[in-house]
Amino acid sequence: MTLAAKLIVLVYVALCFVNESTSQDHSNIYHETLTSLHHKGEFHVKGLFQTPVQYAGDETVLDLYVKKNSGGDVKAVYCLGNKRSIMNQFTDTGTTTDGYDLWRVKIESTPEHISRMISHGPIACNLIWEKVITPAKGNVAEIKGLDLVNFNVNFPRQSTDNVVSRPSTNSQTVDKLLNDTLAKARGVPMSVSVISGICAIILVIFPIFITIANLRRVYLH
């Protein structure tokens, strides 16, 4: 084989290698699968990983697209197992041209989460939804209440994999989630239920101490 032929073969092999590497990188970096999650006809959620978890640093960015079909507003998006508070974990980046609210959620990339995501295991997430109920009759003002939507996030291995799916069971309740996370985000050291319990104990024990003190005073005199 002549020197020119050898050079042509080497260039061809190099181009094939570069093309294969680029294709693999592109398929690993961009996951644009959008899986819709409907919730009682009020809204639906689509999930999108822009960067793979194995290439991420401390956090993996997940884009959640939420379209509202009724009154209300999304107050927070939270993925369980994350050390960040609710208020610091998500970013509202505005509304897209097709009517979706884009929420950028940062999922903590610990070794446990990386292993779970790569093995296509679900990460449990919650969406806190402030529902607005307009009474049908009368001049009663709008009623607002919180609703918690549970869903799973899966890191896709191929374009047909679901990013967002329904959980098998509800792992959290609104009260527990708000007490455990929102209170910490606002700097409240204890939940309302704990404070109420302490106050109740004090109210029961305090009269007993007063009675004992009075009896001791009478006995000494």
Swiss-Prot record:
GO cellular component term of the entry, any: membrane
Extracellular side: 24-191
Signal peptide: 1-23
Entry keyword set: Glycoprotein, Host membrane, Membrane, Signal, Transmembrane, Transmembrane helix
Primary location recorded for the protein, binned into one broad class: host cell
UniProt-annotated glycosylation sites, renumbered to this chain: 19, 179
Cell compartment(s), UniProt: Host membrane
Residues in compartment: Cytoplasmic: 213-221
Record flagged with keyword Signal: yes
Transmembrane segments: 192-212
Topological category with respect to the lipid bilayer: Single-pass type I membrane protein
Name this protein carries in UniProt: Putative transmembrane protein ORF25
Organism, scientific name: Ostreid herpesvirus 1 (isolate France)
